[in-house]
């Protein structure tokens, strides 16, 4: 029985090999799970672990709530949504991958049908009938533990999308629209779903509106449609100036500020004193205004001319007669003033405008508005939206209402409402999802303010205006689309409910829902085939944010600004990692610490700073919240109490970098690596690399192929362990305990007692993945790194996956590199490698190819998989079993048969002789043709697995049965082990209960009244322990319970075995017309060879030019030959100096390992070794690694693992300094400049200068020459031109183009050229003739007319020109 100990400081794998860190900054917070963005999003979508009453209005729940209840057209019946539950998936992830199925769970929704009594006169009508039922709504794909989906047997990832946030955005055209370069401002209300509403200025400063980017209309039409009259519109947008007629003089109410900047058209005096303030013709300044305010002038007498041309703010009506003298927005004329005087109207309200900050835009717009009433405005909008349809009042009103004011058609969403309110200055963050009149008014007001110079336009590339849409949200949208389709069908059927007594199940057809979901996961632009080359590529793929996809940008339309690095990317999106090429800047990667908030905006963590003192409190800030804060960088100098020491601190504020005093600082970065993404954080000395090369380095690490033996990098960054454990490729312990059993294919753990809960098994069995094919044909294989009896904790790594070494990411190999030219073989980034690398299989990789053979039901009969193939010799069938399927372990080469298959041929007319032969010898096998699966050209390897899938209901062949047996044996083995451990646990408890108890009787020599001893128990069979009778009733009851537990265990195991058996034995659901599928997996070993692409982590890539014998390689004075020679000219111009520093530190790491190996070989004491390790790990007196927590055995294991070199970590932007590298080299007794004398292997002479030699981590990339090169003799031809196809996939030929023809013409090689252009290309007759000639041993050629010339003739004839060749 295992008992847990106190949580140790280091994990099981870490203790075996510590990585020495040079980081100066302590990590305040751990790096969050790297896949959390995917996992959390989908968890929130499904809400499976939440009770129905506690479910939030998101995900599936929100989709159902938004569509239901569905009412019938008559209103007499409705369907209501009660809740949903997800069932259990039929197959687990591994089985789904093998069988080519989707990993999904059935969705059952509880629907309530409410029928109202239509005959009742009451309102609301009384309920006549309620029926509830669980309705099956299709299958919902489930996310695996590592953030992927298995769709049709392949792993896929749904990439998050970065799209424009809903809300309102104000922008201008940058002067591009009008030739004068005038800025035209516009506003756009973007809903989450629904019509877009645009407001824009034209060059004449009128305001227009567009709905869904259609024809523009004056904005006043929209305002009239909302029910505003001209008077209301003017009062909303303008301040008014009131004018009174007193004693024949016009007095205006004076607000002095309004006169600023105007030129006085008359003298302005102080009424009381007559003092002149402004002379006629002078501009009114701030000084004049002060004087007016001082004199407390209330009104100003203005000449009549001053009023002419001003605009009326209100309608002018003669109250006695009701006669309209003038409309609001009319200009004041001489006639109008006379008419007003005649009618006794003594007061006029005018709108106040000026050219500076109170433009007359809305007034000008009203003047060009053709409509005069609300109805006319609605009709005008109807005509614009539905041109050609005759408008009616009802139709126009309904259309306008449906555009922006109905929840079904329009939704701003919570994010949109929050962004909208904040932008237009509404205090609350919440509000309706539809628009209101006030919303539209406030947008137009804000737009006019911006035009008037108050406020700024928005930056659409600011991360406060772009949000992330993750998997859960996208799936919810698709689900809603499906539900809306269902709703239409249900509405029609609901009217039949009363008459036909239907149930909810009969009304709802779930097909549209499952079709929408299937389409999204199967073919959406954002549901992508997972990049599985290595663990890092998988992690990066799941953390990717794309601006492309439905509702996003397109490559062609995206400009430079969208792609560029923005200041708000800091700590949210990586400025380095993005693809090269057309997608640059559109596809980004999340930064290491970034996460999304409830609104979908990317947040980054910051430490709170109070009065210049840094606290350990961490807050997440989005780009919106960050703007007004002063944020310092993480490497600011602090004292022991956390006070900032510098007088001026560099910080970020208002999206700018500036210097400020410590007391102003509000926040501080959490870590130096929070700027970059996962891939970039794995590049050591990133701070010394040019950004363009770092970009290549980040991207190329994702293409590194897993090698046969993974080797950890000597120089890393400390992120390796985190990436490996979060990626899901290694096996991580779910619970702590003791390793009970380990072999190559599984690990059995006996779990600690305190980590098991009632009803759970105390056994964890981890089945390892062995030689499994990844999406990119690389090999996924797991190897245990624990031994029987090891005590492990939860979270410890139990088995390494591909590209992991002792739980650390290991993408390549450490090679001894020399920077020097070597006979021109490293010209232009070529790489020269030693034969030893090939011999030691350092870069040998395993690739697994999947080849499929399908037997179908054809018109002529069924295809058959068999070993009886016509016209094939015995030797070709030697690798096949009696079922016609290749044996596992067979080594096959190109052209070998893997699966024998025959297809029926069409009946042919037989000659009399054939008829006779057939009559004598019976049915001949001539009616079938060989269509076997053969190994494609250029491929050879070993068969490692075969899967046979047989259609349900067909007889399985012997091979399929033997595969099933193996499968069952594996399941049986797991269950037996689990049962053994659980039985031992029960018997352990029984013996604990029985020992030293007084017995009243029992099997064997047990006398009543005697005590039970261990000897007695050892003699009696365990099964009979339950027959022992005991005085103590409580103990007897416990024994009874344990006995029942044992019985239940047996039943449970039987049930589980039978369930598994049923799954394994059942037939497969194959596509229509398919009878049987055989999948053969070939393991191909690829050694490194010239033409393969290699790279370091700093963007230093190259192609291998030659493999040199070890004895010819440059070597050091002690005889050690270098592994690889790189060109020194590749460093200065590329500015990736990080590779040189890595080389130096790598040399030190290896040298220290050599010193430790020497100490171990000399059998030095553990104390001496510990003292040396202290010097290495805690070089600057700071305790980074606590060696005291290791006992002597653990210390010696650690030292032994360091023989190959001491792994180092130099975190990005916080790495080793030049001085630290030198001190490490000195500690290892190596030259401090990292340069070594090298000797030429061929001559034995020393090279003139010392050479930089050290260890660099090199990767082999997934661009292998074997995949790119192929050879063709004959093959397929293009249909029209009859020329060979191109490319390896089509088994094509080499193009001999125009320029190549010129080259042969220049040499005068006429016959060679003729051969190239005729018999080797498209002379159909000539090429068959030469084939026959060669067979007959005659090597002459007889060229004819190339087919392409005939095509040309046909094309000329198509133009109506009669062209014919004259034959001599």
Swiss-Prot record:
UniProt keyword Acyltransferase, yes or no: no
SUPFAM superfamilies per record: beta and beta-prime subunits of DNA dependent RNA-polymerase
GO-annotated cellular components: DNA-directed RNA polymerase complex
Domain of life where this protein originates: Bacteria
Reactions catalysed: RNA(n) + a ribonucleoside 5'-triphosphate = RNA(n+1) + diphosphate
Gene Ontology process terms (BP): DNA-templated transcription
Disulfide bond sites: none
GO molecular function: DNA binding; DNA-directed RNA polymerase activity; ribonucleoside binding
EC assignment: 2.7.7.6
Keywords carried by this UniProt record: DNA-directed RNA polymerase, Nucleotidyltransferase, Transcription, Transferase
Entry keyword annotation includes 4Fe-4S: no
UniProt record similarity statement: Belongs to the RNA polymerase beta chain family.
Subunit structure: The RNAP catalytic core consists of 2 alpha, 1 beta, 1 beta' and 1 omega subunit. When a sigma factor is associated with the core the holoenzyme is formed, which can initiate transcription.
Protein purpose: DNA-dependent RNA polymerase catalyzes the transcription of DNA into RNA using the four ribonucleoside triphosphates as substrates.
NCBIfam families: PRK00405.1, rpoB
Protein known as: DNA-directed RNA polymerase subunit beta
Upper lineage: Bacteria, Pseudomonadati, Pseudomonadota, Gammaproteobacteria, Legionellales
């Amino acid at each position: 029985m295992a008992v847990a100990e106190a949580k140790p400081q280091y994990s099981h794998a870490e203790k075996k090999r510590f990585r020495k860190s040079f980081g100066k900054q302590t990590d305040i917070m751990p790096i969050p799970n790297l896949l959390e963005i995917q996992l959390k999003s989908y968890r929130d979508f499904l809400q499976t672990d939440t009770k129905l009453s506690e479910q939030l209005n998101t995900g599936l729940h929100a989709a159902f709530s938004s569509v239901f209840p569905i009412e019938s057209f008559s209103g007499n019946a409705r369907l209501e949504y009660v809740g949903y539950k997800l069932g259990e998936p039929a197959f687990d992830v591994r089985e789904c991958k093998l069988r080519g199925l989707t990993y999904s769970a059935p969705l059952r929704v509880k629907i309530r049908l409410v029928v109202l009594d239509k005959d009742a006169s009451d309102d609301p009508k009384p309920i006549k009938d309620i029926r509830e039922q669980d309705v099956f709504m299709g299958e919902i794909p489930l996310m695996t533990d590592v953030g992927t989906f298995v769709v049709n047997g392949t792993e896929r990832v749904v990439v998050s999308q970065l799209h424009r946030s809903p809300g309102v955005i104000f922008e201008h055209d940058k002067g591009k629209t009008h030739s004068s370069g005038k800025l035209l401002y516009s506003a756009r209300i973007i809903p989450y779903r629904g019509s877009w509403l645009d407001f824009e200025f034209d060059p004449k400063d009128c305001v227009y509106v567009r709905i869904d980017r259609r024809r523009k209309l004056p904005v006043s039409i929209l305002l009239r449609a909302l029910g505003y009259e001209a008077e209301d519109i003017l009062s909303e947008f303008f301040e008014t100036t009131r004018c009174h007629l007193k004693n024949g003089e016009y007095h205006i109410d004076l607000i002095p500020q309004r006169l600023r900047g105007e030129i006085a058209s008359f003298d302005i005096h102080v009424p009381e004193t007559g003092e002149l303030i402004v002379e006629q013709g002078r501009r009114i300044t701030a000084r004049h205004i002060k004087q007016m305010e001082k004199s407390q002038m209330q009104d100003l007498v203005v000449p009549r001319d001053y009023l002419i041309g001003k605009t009326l703010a209100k309608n002018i009506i003669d109250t006695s007669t009701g006669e309209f003298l003038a409309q609001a927005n009319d200009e004041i004329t001489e006639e109008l003033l006379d008419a007003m005087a005649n009618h006794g109207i003594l007061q006029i309200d005018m709108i106040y405008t000026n050219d500076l900050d109170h433009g007359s835009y809305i007034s000008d717009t009203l003047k060009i508005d053709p409509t005069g009433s609300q109805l006319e405005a609605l009709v005008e909008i109807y005509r614009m939206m539905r041109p050609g349809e005759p408008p009616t009042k009802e139709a126009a009103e309904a259309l306008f209402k449906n555009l922006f004011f109905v929840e079904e058609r329009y939704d701003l969403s919570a994010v949109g409402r929050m962004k909208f309110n904040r932008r237009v200055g509404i205090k609350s963050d919440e509000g309706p999802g539809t628009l209101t009149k006030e919303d539209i008014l406030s947008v137009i007001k804000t737009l006019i303010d911006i035009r008037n110079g108050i406020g700024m336009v928005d930056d659409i590339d600011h991360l406060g205006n772009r949000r992330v849409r993750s998997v859960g949200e996208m799936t919810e949208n698709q689900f809603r689309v499906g539900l809306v389709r269902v709703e239409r069908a249900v509405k029609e059927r609901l009217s039949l409910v009363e008459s036909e007594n239907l149930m909810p199940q009969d009304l709802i057809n779930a097909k549209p829902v499952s079709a929408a979901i299937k389409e999204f996961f199967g073919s959406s632009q954002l549901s992508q085939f997972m990049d599985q080359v290595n663990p890092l590529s998988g992690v990066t793929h799941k953390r990717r944010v794309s601006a492309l996809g439905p509702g996003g940008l397109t490559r062609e339309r995206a400009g430079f600004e969208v792609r560029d690095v923005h200041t708000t990317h800091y700590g949210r999106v990586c400025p380095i990692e993005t693809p090269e090429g057309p997608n640059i800047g559109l596809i980004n990667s999340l930064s290491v610490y970034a996460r999304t908030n409830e609104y979908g905006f990317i947040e980054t963590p910051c430490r709170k700073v109070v009065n210049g003192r840094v606290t350990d409190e961490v807050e997440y800030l989005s780009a919106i919240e960050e703007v007004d804060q002063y944020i310092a960088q993480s490497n600011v100098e602090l004292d022991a109490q956390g006070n900032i020491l510098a007088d001026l601190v560099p910080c970020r504020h208002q999206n700018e970098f500036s210097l400020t005093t410590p007391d102003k600082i509000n926040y501080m970065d959490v870590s130096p690596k929070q700027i970059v993404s996962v891939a970039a954080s794995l590049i050591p000395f990133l701070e010394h690399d040019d950004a363009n090369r770092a970009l290549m380095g980040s991207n190329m690490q994702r293409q590194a192929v897993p090698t046969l033996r993974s080797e950890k990098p000597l120089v890393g960054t400390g992120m390796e362990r985190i990436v490996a454990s979060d990626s899901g490729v290694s096996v991580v312990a779910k619970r702590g305990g003791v390793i009970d059993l380990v072999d190559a294919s599984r690990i059995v753990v006996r779990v600690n007692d305190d980590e098991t809960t009632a009803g759970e098994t105390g056994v964890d069995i981890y089945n390892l993945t062995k030689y499994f094919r990844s999406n990119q044909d690389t090999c996924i294989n797991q190897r245990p790194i624990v031994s029987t009896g090891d005590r492990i904790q939860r979270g410890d790594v139990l088995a390494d996956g591909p590209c992991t070494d002792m739980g650390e990411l290991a993408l390549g190999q450490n090679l001894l590199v020399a920077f020097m030219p070597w006979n021109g073989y490293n010209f232009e980034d070529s790489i020269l490698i030693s034969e030893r690398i090939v011999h030691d299989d350092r870069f040998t990789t395993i690739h697994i190819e999947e080849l499929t053979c399908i037997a179908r039901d054809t018109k002529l009969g069924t295809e058959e998989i068999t070993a009886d193939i016509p016209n094939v010799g015995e030797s070709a069938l030697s690798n096949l079993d009696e079922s016609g399927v290749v044996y596992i372990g067979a080594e096959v080469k190109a052209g070998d048969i893997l699966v024998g298959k025959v297809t029926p041929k069409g009946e042919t007319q037989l000659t009399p002789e054939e008829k006779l032969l057939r009559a004598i010898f019976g049915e001949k096998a001539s009616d079938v043709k060989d269509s076997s699966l053969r190994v494609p050209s250029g491929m050879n390897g070993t068969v490692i697995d075969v899967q046979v899938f047989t259609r349900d209901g067909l007889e399985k062949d012997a091979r399929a049965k033997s595969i099933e047996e193996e499968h069952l044996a594996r399941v049986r083995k797991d269950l037996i082990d689990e049962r053994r451990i659980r039985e031992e646990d029960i018997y352990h408890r029984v013996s604990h209960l029985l020992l030293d108890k007084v017995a009243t009787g029992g099997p064997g020599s047990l006398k009543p009244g005697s005590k039970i001893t261990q000897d007695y128990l050892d003699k009696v069979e365990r099964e009979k322990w339950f027959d022992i009778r005991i005085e103590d009733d409580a103990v007897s009851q416990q024994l009874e319970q344990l006995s029942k537990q044992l019985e239940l265990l047996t039943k449970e195991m039987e049930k589980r075995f039978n369930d598994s058996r049923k799954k394994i034995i059942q037939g497969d659901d194959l596509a229509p017309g398919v009878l049987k599928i055989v999948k053969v997996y070939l393991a191909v070993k690829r050694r490194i060879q010239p033409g393969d692409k290699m790279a370091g982590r700093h963007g230093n890539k190259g192609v291998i030019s030659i493999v040199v014998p070890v004895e010819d390689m440059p070597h050091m004075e002690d005889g050690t030959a270098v592994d690889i020679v790189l060109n020194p000219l590749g460093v200065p111009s590329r500015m990736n100096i990080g590779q040189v520093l890595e080389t130096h530190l790598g040399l030190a790491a290896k040298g220290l390992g050599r010193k430790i190996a020497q100490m171990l070989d000399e059998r030095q004491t553990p104390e001496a070794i510990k003292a040396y390790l202290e010097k290495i790990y805690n070089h600057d007196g700071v305790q980074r690694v606590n060696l005291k927590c290791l006992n002597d055995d653990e210390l010696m294991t650690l030292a032994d693992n360091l023989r190959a070199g001491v792994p180092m970590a130099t975190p990005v932007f916080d790495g080793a300094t030049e001085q630290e590298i030198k001190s490490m080299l000195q500690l290892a007794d190596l030259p401090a400049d990292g340069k070594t004398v090298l000797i030429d292997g061929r001559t034995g002479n020393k090279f003139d200068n010392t050479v930089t030699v050290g260890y660099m981590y090199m990767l082999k990339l997934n661009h292998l020459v074997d995949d790119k090169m192929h050879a063709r003799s004959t093959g397929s031809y293009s249909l029209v031109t009859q020329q060979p196809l191109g490319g390896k996939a089509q088994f094509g030929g080499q193009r001999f183009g125009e320029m190549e023809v010129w080259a042969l013409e220049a040499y005068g090689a006429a016959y060679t050229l003729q051969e190239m252009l005729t018999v080797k290309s498209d002379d159909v007759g000539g090429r068959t003739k030469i084939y026959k000639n060669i067979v007959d041993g005659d090597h002459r050629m007889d060229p004819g007319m190339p087919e392409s010339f005939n095509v040309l003739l046909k094309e000329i004839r198509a133009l109506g020109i009669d062209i014919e060749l004259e034959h001599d």
